[in-house]
Amino acid sequence: WIGVRGAASALYLHRQGIENVVPIGCPTMYSNFAGEILPSGIESPRDIAVPFHWSIAVNLLDELCDHRLIGQDVMDEELFLENKSARLSRNISEHLGISKNEAQSKLEYAVSSGGFFPESYQAWYQEIGNQKALLSGRLHAAICGLTQGVPTVLSSWDIRTREIVDYFKIPSASGEQIRKEGSLSAFMNADFEGFNERQNVCWGRWSEFLNQNNIANNSKVYDSSVGPFWNFKTELQNDNEILKTASYLKSENKSGQSRQINRALRVLKRGLKSTVRKTRL
């Protein structure tokens, strides 16, 4: 069996003639089971740290200085440690239609006020885990927050993050929502209940995926009530058949998104929702 992020990736591989491909999400999500996560005690933007990415900086620019900003990649390193903001300021100014000087001034002030760039992966991971809450523009920062039990909302901005949000039901907020409502409102309106309900199902699918591949597995389904009500082997097989069937359907327009494929994907999503309902029994 081959495991991929989500249904769109699985469908793409099926259409290339590759069989036994199923969605399992990101393996990093199975590094630690944190249990139920609730956004309690979040009272102001200062309670919410932001793993930095330019796309989220765009939507938080006017309140960016109210947040703890956590850098991650080489572009962040240039900004946080060397004060080289020209490239990011240009991106932000073009996106918002403001002057580069205004974007640069707000960006540099926010980073100087609350920016943190780690010396190592361990320092970065610890910093993520030490936060009261996270509004993340970074996928793996969000994952490492959730696996450490930190209430986390992910701002998805590409197919990669969208697939992970859909599969795990990660609490999420759109860039437009963050820009219009502000970080606190966007955070508090995110769906943590859906994520909490989905966790045991994802872990059950992961456990069965490893079992099907004869890979040693130290993880388990953390809610024992899941097992009697759902056969995860059958679920993986059903997903595989649905995606295989969908891969035979031809595109009906230039974008390659046919009505039949969309219907097949909706069927798959309904199956995932059905799994969640069964875990409630």
Question: Predicted regions: what is each one?
Answer:
Residues 1-281:
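Active-site anion-handling motifs in enzyme catalytic cores
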